[in-house]
Amino acid sequence: MPNWGGGAKCGACEKTVYHAEEIQCNGRSFHKTCFHCMACRKALDSTTVAAHESEIYCKVCYGRRYGPKGIGYGQGAGCLSTDTGEHLGLQFQQSPKQARSATTSSNPSKFAKFGESEKCPRCGKSVYAAEKVMGGGKPWHKTCFRCAICGKSLESTNVTDKDGELYCKVCYAKNFGPTGIGFGGLTHQVEKKD
């Protein structure tokens, strides 16, 4: 603080900061209106600020600029972004192996293309999130999520799948389970002799 009146200089705009409008961070003073991320201009507070030397950033921009880089250093779901950090002055570099794998796909039909929805294996119509039930690794309509033989409505606890079709446990056991004496209700009865 200067000896002869006034206040400290703002770390962002270099103008005088008076006590009523002052926010301190990392030993520097800022106006409340100047306390923004230096990269994305998002308003900051004491819980969202990350300081680096004389610069202040939101935690996302700080992580992109100064955080660890490479595979395995993602920040949860936030790392699943197409943002390459160019607005931060960062350049994205792919290794030759990554570039080759990005251009070739081992199974292009496994995922729906952007803007398309997944198709129900039973009726072939689009399956939307509100009516989606997963079974056998595929999306089904709730109304189509039935046993292929008896038509019984299925749940995740009583579903079995074979060759892309769904079955209740009873029908699966009768049609695809072990067979012979002692299985599936067939028993060998021995008659008693008197």
UniProtKB/Swiss-Prot annotation:
Motif mapping: Nuclear localization signal: 64-69
Ranges for region Interaction with CLF2: 94-106
Positions bearing Phosphoserine: S95, S153
Primary subcellular site in the record, as a coarse category: nucleus
SUPFAM superfamilies, sorted: Glucocorticoid receptor-like (DNA-binding domain)
Positions of transmembrane segments: none
UniProt cross-references to InterPro entries, sorted A to Z: Znf_LIM (IPR001781)
Single GO molecular function: actinin binding
Segment forming the signal sequence: none
GO cellular component: cytoplasm; cytoskeleton; cytosol; nucleoplasm; nucleus; Z disc
Example GO BP: intracellular calcium ion homeostasis
Ranges where the LIM zinc-binding domain occurs: 10-61, 120-171
Location of the protein in the cell: Nucleus; Cytoplasm, Cytoskeleton; Cytoplasm; Cytoplasm, Myofibril, Sarcomere, Z line
Keywords: Actin-binding, Cytoplasm, Cytoskeleton, Developmental protein, Differentiation, LIM domain, Metal-binding, Myogenesis, Nucleus, Phosphoprotein, Repeat, Transcription, Transcription regulation, Zinc
Domain commentary: LIM zinc-binding domain 1 is required for self-association. LIM zinc-binding domain 1 and LIM zinc-binding domain 2 both are required for optimal actin-bundling activity. LIM zinc-binding domain 1 mediates binding to MYOD1. LIM zinc-binding domain 2 mediates binding to SPTB.
Protein name: Cysteine and glycine-rich protein 3
Naturally occurring in which organism (per UniProt): Bos taurus
Gene that specifies this protein: CSRP3
